[in-house]
Amino acid sequence: MAISRGDKVRIRRPESYWFNEVGTVASIDTSGIRYPVVVRFEKVNYNGFSGVDGGINTNNFAEAELDPA
């Protein structure tokens, strides 16, 4: 599967906060790291302070954990 920057992908990592969610590929690292694909999402996760907007909206994934959306 060839994933490139800007593609919409569905997350297939069961333990991920974004499991089965759709995100956009922000970048792909070619240096050989374990999780080279950075995916950006519309919503943020649960990391943040109470009453304050914030959290993380990107995460790294392996290509095998992504399906085209």
Curated annotation (Swiss-Prot):
**Record's Pfam families?**
PSI_PsaE
UniProt keyword Thylakoid present? yes
Return the GO cellular component terms, semicolon-separated. Answer: photosystem I reaction center; plasma membrane-derived thylakoid membrane
Q: Phosphoprotein: present as a keyword of the record?
A: no
Q: What SUPFAM superfamilies does the record point to?
A: Electron transport accessory proteins (SSF50090)
Q: Report the transmembrane regions from the record.
A: none
Q: Where in the cell is it found?
A: Cellular thylakoid membrane
Q: What GO biological process terms are annotated to this protein in UniProt?
A: photosynthesis
What keywords sit in the KW lines? Membrane, Photosynthesis, Photosystem I, Thylakoid
Q: Could you tell me the membrane topology recorded for this protein? A: Peripheral membrane protein
- Which family is this protein grouped under? Belongs to the PsaE family.
Q: What biological function has been recorded for the protein in this entry?
A: Stabilizes the interaction between PsaC and the PSI core, assists the docking of the ferredoxin to PSI and interacts with ferredoxin-NADP oxidoreductase.
The record's listing under HAMAP family reads: PSI_PsaE
Q: Give the protein name, as stated in the record.
A: Photosystem I reaction center subunit IV
* Organism of origin: Synechococcus sp. (strain RCC307)
Upper taxonomic lineage: Bacteria, Bacillati, Cyanobacteriota, Cyanophyceae, Synechococcales
